[in-house]
Structures are given as C-alpha cells and as structure tokens.
A protein has these predicted regions:
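Substrate-binding/active-site clefts of carbohydrate-active enzymes
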Residues: 330-335, 339-351, 362-370, 375-533, ...
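Active-site-proximal helices and loops of the catalytic beta/alpha 8
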Residues: 387, 391, 542-689, 693-695, ...
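The feature marks proteins involved in alpha-glucan
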Residues: 39-83, 98, 103-207, 229, ...
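Loop/helix patches that line or flank the sugar-binding groove of alpha-linked glycan CAZymes
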Residues: 686-890, 895-912
Length: 955
C-alpha cells in the first residue's frame, strides 16, 4: 500500500552549514499532520483504522475494555516469559512475594484476594541485575521491566501448555497485582525448530509435521474429498519437543485434512478445541475449508517444459535494469471479451495467445518492462473461491446512469462483499494460490494453473513478482474459520501490546516476525513460491512492520538458491517493499525494522514516496487540491490557498529539489545544489517535519513511483488537482510527463497498470472492494473508465462535492485518440530508458560521477528540471565508457504551460540532438524541442520531457 513516511512532501531544505541554512515555514493549514493509517491527528490513541483493507473484512481477538482491578487479571497479559529462566514484569514486588500459577484445565480464579484453581504454584525471586542484554535486544519495548528468576528444575515445556498467571502480593499477603503472560520468548528459547513442517512426501509414506508447543492434544481429521461430512480417519499425532507428527501411507496423497487442536487460548481464558488448516498448507479445498495433501514435486502438476523454465526466463543482467508494472489478476481480463469466458479474471487469462490484454503486455515487454507485479495471489478472504457463489453487477443498468450519479456506487457496494472482487490484502494462508482465480478451487487445479501463468508471463518476456502480505493476518482467535496461525499457537504469531492485546496498526492482527518461528514461516513461504512456482521477485506489503533481520535473512536464503541445486537462480530474485515507519514498530521500538532508513545498504528496495508527493502535491491524506510539481503548483493554480504566490514559489522550488534527489535514485550521499544555492547531500535535504528525503545507499534500493493500486490513479489525481478550466489535452500531457520523470530517474521505475492508457477509476481513491465496475481496464483503448459514477461513498463521500462536477463535465473524458497517444508516448519513454545504460546506472559512485543537475540555485526556474548524464571514452582517462552509442544524455522537464527557452553555456561544445525515438515520435509536440549548438540555447514545448543525446562519432 502506497502511503507516506511523512504526511506531506517536504517543504523545507536543511544543510549542515547552519549559518546558510534555508528554513521554510508552511501556512498553518498545510501543516496539519495526521497518522497515516487512522487519519487522525498524530498523538491520537485510537487504533480504529480507515484503510483500504477495511477491518470490516478482518477479525481480531484483541479488543478489551480497560480495567484496573486484580479481579480482572485474566483480561491482560502484561508479563513476558522471555526465556527459559526469566519472566519480565513491570511490577515492584518490594518486600512482598511473587508467584507463578499454572492450570492445565484453565481453572484459575481470584477468590478472596488469592489465586485458586491451580495445579502448580511456583515462587519467583527478582533478579536485581535486571534483564540481560540479549533480552533487552529482543524485547526493547520492555527493557526497563524487572526480571524474575524461574527455578531451574521447573518443567517449563509442559508448563507453557497451561493457563498461566503471575501474581504479586503485599508483605501482608494481600494480592497486589496479577496478570497473564506472553510466552513467545520462552517458546523461542525452548522450541525453535529447523526440521520439516507441513506434509512431507516420500515414495511410500506421507508424514505430517505441526509446530504447536502449547497444544495439549493434536489430531488430524482425514477426508476423502473436499465436501464429505465425515472423516475417513482421525489420527492422533505424537509430540516431540513441540512438534507433532503422524505418518501414513502414500494413499493419503490427494486427500484433505484439518487439524483438531486442544490448546489454551488467552483471548477466551479457556482450553479450546479448534479446527484449523495446516499453516504450511500447499493446497486447499474451496474457501480454505480443508488442507489438500498435494506433492508439489509431482510431474502431474508441471506444465510441459516446467523444469526448463529457468532457461526460458528473460535475461536480467542487473537489478538496475528492472522496471515494474503492477497489475491485479482480475483487472487484467475480467472485462476483456477477447479472452475465453472460462479464463476471464483468472490465472489462465495470461495463457491466452492473442487477447487484447496479451497484445498490450507484449508491447510493454518489447518496450522494456521487465517485471510484472501481481497483487496478492495467495489464499485471501473477501472473495468466495467458487464463482457460482458470486453476486454480479447489472452492467446494463450501471451504463444507463449519468456519469456523476451516486447510483453506480450504491449498486456496487450492495454486493461488494459477495462479488468476485477484492485486492486480496486479507491473508488467510500465505503459501497456497488463491482459489477464486482458478478454474476449480478444489484439488490441484490452482497449482497447475498458477504455474501455467508464471510460465506464460516468462515467455512473454516478464519476470513475475508476487505481492506478499506477511505483516498481518485476516483473522485471529479460536472461533473464526479464517483464523489459522492464532488457533495453532495462540498469541505467538501475532504482535501484542503491553496489555497482551493484538496490535492493529497495519489494519488488524499484526504479525510478529521478531519471533523465530514467524520469521521461519515467512522465509519458508518465500522459498516455496521461489522454488516451487519459480517466482522472480517479491513486493512486501508494509515491509516496515517486518524486522530488518527477517528481510535480510530472507534475501540471503533466496540469493543462495541455484539453478543446479534448486531449479532457480536465486541471485536474480529482487525484493522490495513499503518501508513506512509507523505504529508500534516505529523508531525500532520492537527491534530494528525494515523501514526505508534501516534497509539501506542491504540491496532491498523500498518505495520512494518523496518523489511521488513532490510531483503530485500534498500527500494521499492531505487536501485533494494541494498541488505539486506536475499538477500546477504556482504555474497553473487551481484556487486552493497554498499561502500566496511567494509561498507557492518556494514550495515549487523545494519540490524540485526532492524530485532531483529522487531522479538521482534517492541516494543519501549524492551531492547537488539545492534551491538555496548550497551544495548538500541527498540526506541533507529535509521534509518540513525534519525527515531526510534521501535514504538509499545504492540505486536498486529506490523504487520510484507516482501511482500504485492505492489512492487515485495518476490520471484521476491529475484531473482532481489541476484547474478545472484546462483542457483534457493538457491533462493527458501531464499524465505522460509524470510517467516520463519516473522512467528517466535512476533507480527502479514502478508503474501502475493503466498509467500508460490514462486509466481512471472515476476518482475512487481506494478501490480495494469497488468491484470490476470501478477497477475496469479497457485494452481495446475505447474508454479509460472516466465518468462511470461517483466513487463508493465509504472512502470518497467527503470529496464528492469536488468530484461530481468533474465527472459531469464531458470535456474531462479522454477520447480514444488521447488513449492511443498516451500509450505511444509511454512506449517511447520506455524505449529511451533502455536505449542507454546511462539511464540505468548500477552504482552510487557512477551516479555521483556522471549525473548532474543544471538550472539550480535561487535564481533558477523552478518549473524546469535539467539533468545530464556523461559517459567516458574508450582508451581515454577519466570515466569509463558504458554506452557505445551515446556519450552524453540530457533530460529536460518543462512543467510550465508555455514554451521554455533558456541557455546553458557549459553545454555549447556538445553536439546534442533530440533523441531519435522522440524525433520519430507520434507526439508532434515533442518534436518542437530545439537546441542551438552554437549558443547552448534550448527551447522546450510546454508540459513536456525532452531527451537530447550526443552520439559518438566513429574514429
């Protein structure tokens, strides 16, 4: 999800030269900062999320009203059993006493100020030395808690299966405090496990392995088929050191099973008998009702040529050569009449040979897009796997309604939880393809069809990226049928606050990758997708909520894969994600997390929200009319009060600084001249709230983007922020201008599907559950989907007064000619990017040595960006030669609504000409870009990005 580290793009620039530092104060109405997930003022204690993954679609067992009486101790788990020998608790026992109580049958109660109903009562003594350094490192948020020693002869392995309470008593014996315990630390200490998990197949046997150290009893209920009411066998598993196992005949393969687990669950204070899928499931029945026993190595599940697919994958010489196109599986084909109806909206649509969508993808691949990023394709909640259960919209009715009607959204929202659409950020099981995208959600069909999709995309020239959501779970607790991990080992897989309730900052049911077996599950899951499905990259949703250690370990494990040993080349697998730093993990509160600033130097990419916000203006949660570099700030005002013309001029200059840092791959140490005339590093350019703009150590750690599935589409946000009176031609040029800046930036460019064809969602800012109607992509290029009704009320109603007149105005809607020109222009910029390695420099040193910005400093034109990249010459000292064709590239961006003429005297010796691709472009406007070699004088048409090159002369 594409949100910001800061709540707005930066409006101030700082430098280490304090005497020369430039400070810029925003008008107060632009300074309002909000928590980006709750949209509440920062400092608010509310955790009610208003985010695209609406918590209406998720369930959590974390809620409890605050109470303070010792009588209510069971509602809380405020103590931490951090290791075999230590319990941490922030209670001063003093001269009193402290005891640990355990009940195998969850019968603890407080009667007459005394804990009763226990099977074990253990006296604890405080360790005055406090918590060890290792404990403080693993649990930094409780580093100041007191340490209580656990007797060395205690049978801890059996004790953790019980209901546990720690109690403190006054010297007179009166109960002072009592609470439950969080036991992830001691589970890691005693039960960390490296052996097999899930179903393991051999020639003669199938063995089940389940990690469940707190379970009292585990049985596997085996079913012949996905819907039979009675199991054909119930198998009791045996436990060894927290791992439960059972072995059966090979005939189990192809059957279904669920686990029946008896386990204490703190959320209900009871021993619960729960029914759950295998956390390591590799197959499922429809809607994940049962785990399917499938051997992914079976030849029957391999498309023809599957084992040789690594040899067919498109070449990847460097991660710097990557460009990413983000696409939802259903969006691609649900409304494409050229796709066989049985394939529409599913995996097999990508295997169609000549559909409109496939023809479109072929053009993008030929132009340079290397990686296709698919929104979640694991088993998620919110969409039934069986299509006959879906409710479908009446498109004929919807098409009859006016473009600004609220009728369309009313019709869609009435069925939105029962249709076939959801983005999929509601994870149930991470390691199984989503059943609703398969022809048959039962059996092995989803596995085979997913593999066919990957194979087809590789053969089209794309490497495949999966969107993985390891930061939260759709459900928790013992009763929700979509709850899995929290049923098996209650309270372990989820991150809990100091009261013991589940953290919800991501939306709900935050996971805890700081726990050993959570990290292991994540890495094992990645290995499954990489090895068994031959996936080429992973995009981590809310990566900042995952520990840096987990991400680095995952990268190292994946990189170690080889074609000879594993059938894949792990060094070609690229990892990137959302490095936002917020919630309970902010500022390393739970350990070093994988935030933007923390992952630099790892080679893991993170989304650059700085360039996005500077280009568009404001932030996704600011006022929708706040303008930015490409949406008319200062140059085409829309009437919004930014604080006056001088303020707008400064804002535009600072936004330009941020864009230039982003175009230099957002490198911390890249040196440029800022709008105040000072030479500063990228890390010394700051947002208005003091956050460094740059964070990367090498170019592949920056993923530059201006739009993604979150928030409005690029065309929509441009249509919202630009003045109502400008023409649709200008809006289309701005759409192209914005994508060209991303394409010509160093680092990795990322594009949202449809950016290239002016895609609209009728100004829906959060279409995660808005159905096919608002999410349509038309690869026939007849419509961009603008003006199909007011967007859904839930997330957009406050903007309806702004949206309604725009949708009603027919002049806002692009015609087919606009869409076709936009596509041609997008193809042009991709081809230009891949025409020279100078636009894809591989190291920070190369960028620092070769890339320069002109038209900088206080007297510069803030509406013009001029970037040059210089190459060396073979056999001459200085820079090495990278490009055999061009020795110099100049990119000029003009966001002004008029021609821009200027001179750069230092370029007079350069024999520059417009790039051949632009000289032959279908864009007649860009052909008007000129350069006078004798004077160094340029003339650039309005709202355009011109690329000039100096060709090498043969000697």
């Amino acid at each position: 999800m594409s949100f910001s580290l800061s709540s707005s793009f930066s409006f101030s620039t700082k430098t280490t030269h304090l005497s020369d530092s430039i400070r810029f104060s925003l008008p107060s109405h632009l300074k309002v900062r909000t928590n980006i997930w709750t949209r509440r003022p920062l400092g608010s204690s509310s955790i009610s999320p208003l985010r695209r993954r609406s918590c209406k679609c998720c369930s959590s067992m974390s809620a409890a009203e605050p109470v303070s009486s010792p009588q209510d101790y069971i509602l809380y788990s405020r103590a931490y059993w951090v290791s075999r020998t230590v319990i941490a608790w922030n209670v001063n026992v003093g001269d009193g006493s402290c005891f640990l109580y355990a009940s195998k049958y969850a019968s603890l109660l407080n009667s007459d100020d005394e804990i009763q109903g226990y099977h074990h009562k253990i006296k604890l003594h405080e360790d005055t030395a406090g918590l060890s350094a290792n404990v403080k490192e693993k649990f930094p948020h409780i580093r100041d808690y007191r340490a209580f020693k656990v007797p060395s002869d205690l049978d801890v392995k059996n004790l953790v299966k019980c209901q546990l309470v720690i109690a403190a008593y006054q010297p007179n014996g009166q109960l002072k405090d009592a609470t439950g315990l969080q036991i992830a630390g001691v589970l890691d200490d005693l039960f960390s496990y490296h052996g097999p998990l899930g179903a393991v197949f051999s020639k003669e046997f199938v063995t089940l392995y389940l990690w469940a150290p707190t379970a009292q009893v585990v049985r596997a209920c085996l079913y012949q088929d996905p819907s039979s009411s009675s199991p054909i066998e119930v198998i009791k598993l045996d436990e060894l050191n927290g791992v439960w196992t059972a072995t059966g005949p090979k005939s189990w393969e192809g059957c279904y099973y669920v686990y029946e687990v008896s386990v204490y669950h703190a959320s209900t204070s009871q021993i619960e008998k729960v029914i759950a899928n295998d956390p390591y499931a590799r197959g499922l029945s429809a809607d994940g009702q049962r785990t399917f026993l499938v051997d992914l190595s079976s030849d029957a599940l391999k498309p023809e040529g599957w084992d040789n697919l690594p040899d067919e994958k498109p070449p990847l010489h460097s991660f710097s050569d990557i460009s990413i196109y983000e696409l939802h599986v259903r969006d691609f084909s649900a409304n494409d009449p050229t796709v066989p109806s049985e394939f529409c909206g599913g995996y097999l649509a990508f295997t169609s040979q000549d559909s409109a969508g496939i023809r479109h993808l072929k053009r993008l691949s030929s132009a340079g897009i290397t990686h296709l990023h698919l929104l979640p394709t694991f088993q998620f909640a919110g969409v039934a796997d069986e299509r006959d259960k879906w409710k479908n919209a009446d498109n004929q009715l919807l098409e009859s309604l006016p473009p600004d009607s609220d009728g369309q959204q009313a019709h869609i929202t009435a069925i939105q939880n029962d249709d076939g659409y959801n983005w999929g950020y509601n994870p149930v099981l991470w390691g199984v393809p989503k059943g609703s995208y398969a022809s048959d959600p039962n059996g092995s069909c989803r596995t085979l069809e997913f593999r066919k999709m990957v194979q087809a995309l590789n053969r089209l020239g794309f490497r495949v990226v999966l969107d993985v959501v390891y930061n939260h779970l759709h459900a928790s607790g013992p009763s929700d049928e979509k709850s899995v991990l929290d049923k098996i080992v209650p309270g372990y897989y989820v991150r809990r606050n100091t009261d013991g309730h589940i953290e919800n900052s991501t939306c709900t049911n935050n996971t805890a990758s700081e726990n050993f077996m959570v990290e292991r599950l994540i890495i094992d899951d990645l290995l499954c997708w990489a090895v068994d499905y031959k996936v080429d990259g992973f995009r981590f949703d809310l990566m900042g909520h995952i520990m840096k250690r987990t991400m680095v370990n995952a990268k190292n494990v994946l990189s170690s894969l080889s074609k000879d040993a594993n059938g894949v080349e792990g060094s070609d697998i690229y990892l990137y994600g959302e490095g936002w730093d917020f919630g309970e993990v902010a500022k390393n509160a739970r350990g070093t997390n994988a935030s933007q600033f923390n992952v630099h130097g790892t080679g893991i990419g993170s989304f650059n929200d700085r360039i996005r916000d500077a280009l568009l203006g404001g932030s996704p949660f600011g006022h929708p009319l706040q303008q930015g570099f490409v949406t008319g700030l200062l140059l085409q005002p829309n009437g919004y009060d930014h604080g006056g013309k001088e303020v707008e001029k400064k804002m535009l200059a600072v936004a330009k600084d941020h864009i230039q840092v982003g175009m230099a791959a957002n490198l911390k140490d890249f040196v440029l001249t800022n709008c105040g005339g000072q030479e500063v590093k990228g890390s010394e350019v700051y947002s208005y709230d003091g956050i460094s703009v740059a964070y990367a150590s090498n170019p592949t750690e920056t993923v530059n983007y201006i739009s993604a599935h979150d928030n409005e589409t690029l065309f929509d946000i441009i249509s919202l922020k630009t003045p109502a009176g400008i023409s649709v031609d200008e809006r289309c040029r701005l759409n192209h201008l914005a994508t060209s800046i991303i394409a010509f930036s160093q680092g990795i460019p990322f594009f949202h599907a449809g950016d290239e064809i002016l895609r609209s969602k009728s100004l829906d800012r959060d279409s995660y559950n808005s159905g096919d109607w608002f999410n349509r992509i038309d690869f026939s290029y007849n419509s961009n989907n603008w003006g199909i009704g007011l967007p859904p009320k839930e997330k957009n109603e406050s903007n309806w007064p702004l949206i309604r007149p725009r949708l009603a105005d027919v002049s806002f809607k692009p015609q087919r000619s606009h869409i076709l020109l936009a596509l041609e222009n997008f193809i042009d910029v991709l081809q230009i990017r891949y025409s020279s390695p100078l636009l894809r420099l591989r190291t920070a040193n190369a960028i620092q040595q070769r890339l320069r910005f002109h038209n900088t400093g206080p007297s510069s034109n803030p509406g013009i960006v001029v970037m040059s990249i210089e190459d060396g010459h073979e056999g001459l000292p200085g820079l090495s030669q990278l490009d055999p064709i061009y020795s110099y590239i100049l990119v000029i961006i003009n966001v002004q609504p008029t021609d821009s003429s200027f001179t750069i005297p230092t370029l007079r010796p350069r024999n520059l000409q417009l790039h051949p691709i632009q000289m032959n472009s279908t864009d007649e406007v860009i052909k008007n870009s000129t350069y006078d070699v004798s004077t160094g004088h340029f003339c650039i048409p309005p709202l355009s990005t011109a690329v000039f090159v100096e060709q090498r002369t043969s000697e």
